[in-house]
Amino acid sequence: DRYYTRRQAELLDKQIDDPNIITTFAMRYGNPSIKKMLTHLQKAGCESIVVLPLYPQYCAATTATVCDEVFRVLMKMRWQPQVQIVPRYYDHPVYIKAMVNSLERDLERLEFEPKQIVLSYHGVPKKYLQKGDPYHCQCHVTTRLIREQWPYKDIPIETTFQSRFGPQEWLQPYTDETLEGLGKQDIDSIMMACPGSVSYTHLRAHETAM
């Protein structure tokens, strides 16, 4: 994640092209940490900060922890800049269009014609949904909007959830079980994508490939 997140920040900085705006990144669980980056911005004299969580769909386990950590760090600093948090953008037209365009480019690079597209989102325990977390619903809305703009209507698109562990029930359908089921239906050419994170993840790609 770190490599791609850094590259995104670098490319965004080039696009903004404003010497008065610092475009950088921080990791929730890694380096540079949110604390380290906020300290850097303080020393740089920043008075206004825009925080962009790289999770299109809101979840208490992801987006909320980023926001919590930002304000937890600021509470202990004698520096209170104006802070704006970019809200969830799971249904934003620009995001949806970018996902569709990305899928089309990937489809053109394939050496086979897929019979099915599986959109695999990072899973969370089902109890999150039962407590009112909107993540599950927002993932399905993202898939629906992608499906509506997808030009190849003969290739169906399905939502699944991956990365579960432990004995408790997680969001379903599970990615691995879905792939097994498709194989039993003789659907042997499948295209997969993970639209639940703006930053590409090797771990998730490897996991789903397994």
In which residue ranges do the predicted regions lie?
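Short, high-confidence coil segments that cap the C-terminus of an alpha-helix
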Residues: C46, F112-P114, I187-D188
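N-terminal glycine-rich anion-binding loop in soluble enzyme alpha/beta folds
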Residues: D1-I22
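Short, flexible loop segments at boundaries between secondary-structure elements
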Residues: Q84-P93, R144, P151, Q162
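Conserved small/polar residues in nucleotide/adenosyl-binding loops
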Residues: T201-T208
